[in-house]
């Protein structure tokens, strides 16, 4: 009651892709709003300060742009903020080259994944200064922040699972074989919101349908 899930929390599948992610996210969000509008969440207490802090955080990219645009001396590149498209291009390059993208023939390994995590951490630092010139770009800015966090999660899980579980989707060049003895399991993670560090663990797979 009052818990809404999307993505792997409602059933893991390798074929969900981005379209499945945003579709399930939209469905979960609309269901949560309906839950609130129907007064089912009336026991949840939120202070005025919490609301104001949340609004300030959400609209910060608009402020970053308003201040930073005055420092532009030519073109559209600012020394004090990053635009959503600039951040997106960096994110795509990191995931493509270090986490088994098409230009790497879907191949990655321990060292590449660790370097990818380092570059993702740098990007997340820079996204604290993402700028948005209008509400559409504000949406893009937050979409980028969430995509970067999702990418970090994908990279952490790929590094933790020491095998190639999905040949064709990605390959661990240093762990090319399927290892059912050690890795016929689910991997779950918890992210510390204060430190950004992930804690990884294995969970058993329960087959509810016979393989035969």
Where are these regions (language model features)?
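Glycine- and aromatic-enriched mobile tails/lids
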Residues: 1-212
């Amino acid at each position: 009651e009052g818990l809404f899930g999307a993505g792997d929390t409602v059933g893991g599948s390798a074929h969900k892709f981005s379209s499945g992610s945003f579709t399930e996210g939209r469905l979960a969000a609309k269901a949560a709003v309906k839950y609130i509008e129907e007064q089912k969440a009336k026991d949840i207490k939120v202070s005025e300060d919490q609301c104001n802090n949340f609004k300030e955080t959400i609209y910060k990219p608009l402020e970053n742009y308003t201040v930073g645009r005055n420092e532009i001396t030519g073109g559209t590149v600012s020394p004090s903020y990053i635009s959503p498209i600039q951040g997106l291009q960096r994110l795509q390059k990191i995931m493509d080259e270090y986490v088994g993208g098409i230009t790497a023939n879907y191949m990655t390994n321990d060292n590449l994944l660790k370097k990818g995590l380092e570059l993702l951490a740098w990007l997340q630092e820079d996204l604290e200064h993402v700028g948005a010139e209008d509400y559409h770009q504000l949406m893009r800015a937050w979409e980028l922040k969430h995509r970067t966090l999702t990418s970090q999660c994908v990279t952490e899980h790929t590094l933790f699972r020491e095998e190639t579980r999905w040949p064709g989707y990605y390959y661990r060049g240093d762990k090319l074989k399927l290892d059912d003895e050690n890795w016929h399991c689910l991997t779950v993670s918890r992210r510390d919101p204060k430190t950004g560090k992930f804690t990884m663990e294995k969970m058993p797979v329960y087959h509810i349908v016979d393989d035969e």
